[in-house]
Amino acid sequence: MPAEANQVIENIKLIPGGEELVNKAILSLNRSAEDAVKEATPIFKNAIRNMSIADAGKILFGPDSAATAYLRQTTYQELKTAFAPKVRASLDKPLVAGVSTNETWNTLSDAYNKVANTMVAKIAGLKPVNISLEEYATQKALDALFVKVAEEEKAIRTDPVARINEILKRVFGQLDKK
């Protein structure tokens, strides 16, 4: 959950059944990311197919994160566009009693913000929560995807066993000869 949601979450947990609701909402956020990540493969394949010889050379002989940086630069916006509807659909699935994670978040954050916007709450240091759960989940899914890509890239560059096909063996094998 977004850090901005901590005050809301802590108060929800005080309500009977609130902790279960929070846990289900977190699970729903995780599932939304899993649903969205499936969209990455064709987008990555397209970026690799459209790679120039110069780009390939920069990746091969560049820093350990060159491939990850290339994919982030060439696919990020397209991935974000592809992920957003998947994340939204997942967060719109019924969570408890036919109410979705998005509906629950919007209701709770609206109620919290009504309190947080009062003079007493401002004096007490409460701040309104203004974050889109969909945008947050989409961003976190993209962050996690590129962390995984970076881990795979590091393995391919440093461990010949991670080079699972002939192309990877032939291309990245050149690094072993240095």
Regions found by a protein language model. Give the residues of each.
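A cross-kingdom marker for long, charged
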Residues: 134-178
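Extracytoplasmic beta-rich ectodomain segments of secreted or membrane-anchored proteins
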Residues: 22-70
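Mature, extracytoplasmic segments of signal peptide-bearing proteins
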Residues: 127-130, 134
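N-terminal Sec/ER secretory leader and immediately downstream segment
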Residues: 1-36
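A contiguous pocket-lining binding segment that forms or flanks enzyme active sites
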Residues: 64-111
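Hydrophobic alpha-helical segments of membrane proteins
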Residues: 82-90, 94, 115, 141-148, ...
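Extended amphipathic ligand-handling, pore-lining, and cofactor/metal-binding catalytic surfaces
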Residues: 104, 111-127
